[in-house]
Amino acid sequence: MNDQSCVRIMTEWDIVAARQLGRNVAKELGFGTVDQARITTAISELARNIYLYAGKGQIGIEQVADRGKKGLKIIAEDQGPGIPDIRKVMEDGFSTSGGLGAGLPGVKRLMDEFSLNSVAGEGTEIQAIKWLR
């Protein structure tokens, strides 16, 4: 099962579209309202980071399966400046935009799996999975 849909992130309205897509896919997979909220919050944080720090990128939403489990994978990709200090951005409360600093650590807490790959000057890819229970 690898059914992927993407939303290009270039405006704030694209963040809303990505959230809605994620909620629809989560609902279709059978996630309850609490997990739907977790997924849409994670998408919102990732899409907002693309918009604020990279200027443009995309959010992919993919249905995944592994050893009899079904889940939803979020893939956030951009070709922005990259993240110079990954350890720092994964600290609770860290923000360069004056936000709450819940961003990436919050996404990691909301989802079951989280990976981050960033190369200075080339961009960032973040993948996060929520498994259906």
Swiss-Prot record:
Its EC number is 2.7.11.1. Disulfide bonds: none annotated. The keyword Kinase applies. InterPro entries: HATPase_C_sf. GO terms for molecular function: ATP binding; protein serine kinase activity; protein serine/threonine kinase activity. It holds the Pfam family HATPase_c. Keywords: ATP-binding, Kinase, Nucleotide-binding, Serine/threonine-protein kinase, Transferase. It catalyses: L-seryl-[protein] + ATP = O-phospho-L-seryl-[protein] + ADP + H(+); L-threonyl-[protein] + ATP = O-phospho-L-threonyl-[protein] + ADP + H(+). It comes from the Bacteria. Provides the crucial link between the upstream module (communication of environmental stress) and the downstream module (integration of the environmental signals with signals of energy stress) that compose the signal transduction pathway controlling the sigma-B factor. Phosphorylates and inactivates its specific antagonist protein RsbS thanks to its serine kinase activity. Upon phosphorylation of RsbS, RsbT is released to stimulate RsbU, a PP2C phosphatase, thereby initiating the signaling cascade that ultimately activates sigma-B. This is Serine/threonine-protein kinase RsbT.
